Amino acid sequence: MAEERMIESFDGTQLFSRKDTAENQRAVAVISHGLAEHLGRYDALAKTLLSNGFTVYRYEQRGHARSDGKRTHFDDFNEMPDDLKTIMDLAKEENSDTPIFLIGHSMGGFTAAAFGTKYPGQAAGIVLSGALTRYNNQLFGQLPMDLPEDTYLDNELGEGVCSDPAVVEAYANDPMVEKKISVALINQFGTGIDWLKANAKNFTDPVLVLHGNEDGLVAEKDSRDFYGEIGSADKTLKIYASLMHEIFNEPSKYKIYDEVVEWIQERL
């Protein structure tokens, strides 16, 4: 059963969300998407989670797709983990006494890592995919960018997302993928990553850190550094040979989904 609705975040911003309820629910998974994309790009992952008894909550980050807010714009990086907290709180309210896991990809991985750092112990476990937790690959050059915050740059991320040409083509032609990215958003990555690094020891949740070693957008070293610096006792790092940025969309994605499911099941 699927339910789509607008959820009011901490500052009144309306976030588009979708809840898919598992028939024989064992746990809940909340998915946080990446820069310029939308929740529909996680349909295959959600379907696998559902079939394993995980109710799935997804939402669109502010300024993305069907959510409110200035397009691809953040005034403060804290808006990312605080919007996510709104969704996590909703999931807890609707699923009391059920473990709630968090899955974040790329910018959504930053969001999930920041959530775990700011609100430790709220998630039963966190899965990070190609997460922007450091800035070893200076994709946007030195931060902050010396441009007005309201400047918008073309979204040129498409070529680096995946080795599957069909995924690259679908991304380019997807009307819900944002075509412009604000300097304000990019500069908040710089501020947020500095904060994440300074507070690494505060991240203590169980975590599965996943990265493709052919990722041309977010450096594999970001995940290695994050993994090495956090305070979690239960932590696993997995680097996939020959995979690009979107490991959840690579041809071997179902094998990776199974590994995510297995990791969650071991913590129930």
Positions of the model-derived regions?
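N-terminal cap/lid segment of alpha/beta-hydrolase-fold proteins
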Residues: 1-22
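Conserved alpha/beta-hydrolase
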Residues: 41, 46-69
